[in-house]
Regions:
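Membrane-embedded beta-barrel scaffold of Gram-negative outer-membrane proteins
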Residues: 186, 272-288, 394, 401-402, ...
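Conserved C-terminal beta-signal and adjacent last beta-strands/turns
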Residues: 178-180, 217-219, 530-639
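Structural signature of Gram-negative outer-membrane beta-barrels, strongest in the C-terminal barrel
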Residues: 323-329, 342-459, 545
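Extracytoplasmic beta-strand/coil segments of soluble accessory domains associated
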Residues: 66, 70-107, 126
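N-terminal periplasmic "start-of-domain" segments of outer-membrane beta-barrel proteins
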Residues: 27-63, 88, 96-99, 213
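Short acidic/polar hinge/loop motifs at secondary-structure boundaries
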Residues: 106-132
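Gram-negative outer-membrane beta-barrel transporters
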Residues: 362-366, 458-460, 479-568, 602, ...
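Transmembrane beta-barrel wall of Gram-negative outer-membrane proteins
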Residues: 169-196, 201-236, 252-274, 322-326
């Protein structure tokens, strides 16, 4: 408890400081789409939402979405160290496959929810929206503990272009080319980037990641709009480590590549009726290969695999605007999933259809609510129903109370359903599911740009899928374990005098396995009465940004991660990783504004892990030590 209370001052002090110093700058709440699929101010929603702007990403030198998510309350990002190493997100204590990931509305998760954030860069990103809490009522499977949606730039304003470049420690080098432009009728934005590094290990740790992204929007008349987004990524990561963290291989690597396409069409039929249709397609190729270190290596057997996963979906919905500013959304969705390659015996596919209903009352009123229900019909496990309800009440002045309840589910992945050979999949698996409730208070100090919010959440996860290696069972995967996660999130934001911006957050998390799986050994994932792995009990962030007029900014960010349980696969015992604090320093400075016939020039720099803190996010996998990145940007067009 003392440690918990000790973390509160960094979160609370911006509010106290700002209360003594009034500011002339009032920051408007961002408008979010992901929470209700309707443009809504974040401070009017009965759910927990964090928005990270593209401007902040660039000002703080954040290159990957995984790094950006570290500042989100309730989010635990776990990586295996080098650039390109596996990056997982545990949101509010849930599993790493409990978060739906979208890019411009296109699902990026593999069927079954898994997603590796290692190769998801912030290139050409306009903003990131993070919704915490079950959102299956709108997005179906995978949205158990939340949704992360990345929006790319849609191209507004006079035509402009930029070339960014830089390099740093670990032989890191990067280049990005962007171009955008448009008006109210049409707009475009394209980006091409490449990032590479030699890694932190002495051998076989090269990484390179190339991304092409584009967004096109059209508005042929006042009632019709259309948009298309395209993204293609190609990443290759060499790593010497085995599952225990020992660097043993000179010839081990993996490849992740594939396209993503989204199309959306909207039409306003009348003042009261709007229709929207969204089509999505994502195809991902995951490859892995290992070869002996040399002729004398008789213990490493050559192996390679290649799998293609495809998700194609169609979503149609009608927004009906009722009297009093209330909106009813009626929608239906269909998705086709396939997997083929070397992991499964042949090709497998499944379909899912769904119907959903949502009511959003006028969120500008002192008392407002959201209600939603959904019914999914899956080709494999049958029908499954989810619901969500939220309430927002403006209590007094700048104080608002929120509360919500909801359910979510996650379908099994193809391997858990269809594996053959040494591992036997279970075609009769049921989806993992959850029940969640949360309640909180939000206070905006009148006359200032200071907001403080505290939220308590409680989640129950049931029918978790667990591996049983016994030869006596018909299937190796079974719905057995259950777990609970409860916690407290405190977040504050303050803009002081227009030049200083402070954000702070603290999360307390308590997880517990309520029903263990078949494996009762020390390395088991689910042991009755034990906490879930790799989730810290305490975590906090503090970011202080200072604007240098219109010419640039400097930001210092402190990230604290408390003790968390893990497994040491060298000793085959449970372990507790120690707490650590990482401090980053970033800055940008405009040296020259673009002019006719001459580009503008800006310089950027970042020191990650400023004080060279040694730490591990996964046992035996060291994180990056102090590293420096310096770069520049040439800007063409209107400043």
């Amino acid at each position: 408890m003392r440690q918990w209370l000790g973390m509160l001052p960094p979160v609370v002090f911006p509010m106290v400081l700002a209360a003594q110093q009034r500011t002339d700058t009032v920051t408007l709440a961002p408008v979010v789409v992901t929470a209700t699929r309707l443009p809504t101010r974040a401070d009017a929603l009965p759910t927990s939402v964090t928005v990270i702007s593209g401007a902040r990403l660039r000002a703080e030198g954040i290159r990957t979405v995984a790094e950006a998510l570290r500042i989100v309350p309730g989010a635990a990002v776990v990586t295996t160290g080098p650039w390109g190493g596996q990056a997982s997100l545990f949101l509010r204590g849930g599993e790493s496959d409990y978060v739906r990931v979208l890019i411009d509305g296109v699902p990026q998760n593999a069927p079954g929810g898994s997603y590796d954030f290692a190769n998801l860069t912030t290139d050409n990103v306009e903003r990131i929206e993070v919704v915490r809490g079950p959102t299956s009522v709108l997005y179906g499977s995978d949205a158990v503990t939340g949704v992360v949606q990345i929006f790319t730039r849609d191209g507004r304003g006079a035509p402009r272009a930029a070339v960014a470049f830089g390099g740093g420690t670990y032989a890191t080098n990067a280049v990005e080319v962007t171009a955008s432009g448009g008006d109210d009728r049409a707009g475009y934005a394209i980006g091409l980037s490449r990032f590479a590094s030699d890694g932190i290990y002495r051998f076989n740790n090269d990484y390179r990641n190339e991304v092409l992204s584009g967004h096109l929007r059209l508005k042929p008349d006042a009632r019709t709009d259309a948009a298309m987004s395209v993204r293609y990524g190609d990443a290759r990561y060499h790593f010497p480590t085995d599952g225990s963290g020992d660097p043993v291989s000179n010839n081990q690597h993996q490849v992740d590549r594939g396209p993503s396409v989204g199309l959306e069409l909207g039409h306003v039929f009348s003042d009261d009726v709007e229709g929207r249709v969204t089509g999505t397609w994502h195809r991902d190729n995951a490859q892995y290969a290992i070869a002996p270190n040399g002729p004398s290596d008789t213990t490493t057997f050559p192996f390679s695999s290649s799998d293609w996963v495809t998700r194609a979906g169609l979503d149609g919905r009608a927004n009906l605007r009722l009297s009093g500013g209330n909106v009813v959304t009626v929608g239906g969705a269909f998705e086709h999933e396939t997997m083929q390659g070397t992991t499964l015996d042949g090709s497998r596919s499944r379909d899912d259809g769904a119907a959903y209903l949502q009511l959003v009352t006028n969120l500008e009123r002192p008392f407002s609510m959201t209600l939603g229900a959904r019914l999914d019909d899956n080709q494999r496990f049958g029908t499954y129903a989810t619901y969500r309800a939220g309430l927002s009440v403006r209590v007094h002045g700048g104080t608002r109370a929120i509360a919500s309840i909801g359910t979510g589910f996650k379908e099994p992945n193809f391997f858990e359903n269809y594996a053959t050979g040494f591992v036997r999949g279970n075609p009769d698996l049921q989806p993992e599911h959850s029940f969640t409730w949360e309640a909180g208070l939000e206070h905006h100090i009148p006359g200032t740009a200071v907001t403080v919010r505290a939220t308590y959440f409680n989640q129950r996860f049931r029918d978790l899928i667990d591996y049983n290696g016994s030869d006596s069972v018909t299937y190796n995967y079974l719905n057995v374990p259950g777990a609970d996660a409860r916690g407290l999130e405190i977040a504050s934001e303050a803009a002081l005098g227009g030049a200083v911006h402070i954000t702070a957050a603290y999360t307390f998390l308590d997880t517990r396995v309520t029903r263990g799986g078949a494996d009762t050994g020390s390395t088991a994932l689910f042991l009755t009465g034990q906490p879930l792995l790799r989730r810290p009990w305490h975590s906090a962030t503090l970011a202080l940004s200072y604007r240098l007029g219109r010419r640039g900014s400097m930001t210092v960010t402190a990230l604290y991660t408390g003790r968390r349980p893990d497994v040491d696969y060298r000793t085959l015992r449970r372990d507790t990783l120690p707490s650590y604090t990482r401090v980053d320093l970033a800055g940008q400075l405009d040296l020259r504004q673009p002019q006719a016939g001459a580009p503008g020039l800006a310089v950027v720099g970042k020191v990650e892990n400023l004080f060279d803190a040694p730490y591990q996010e996964v046992t035996n996998f060291p994180a990056r030590r102090r590293n420096l990145f310096l770069g520049g940007e040439l800007r063409f067009g209107t400043p």
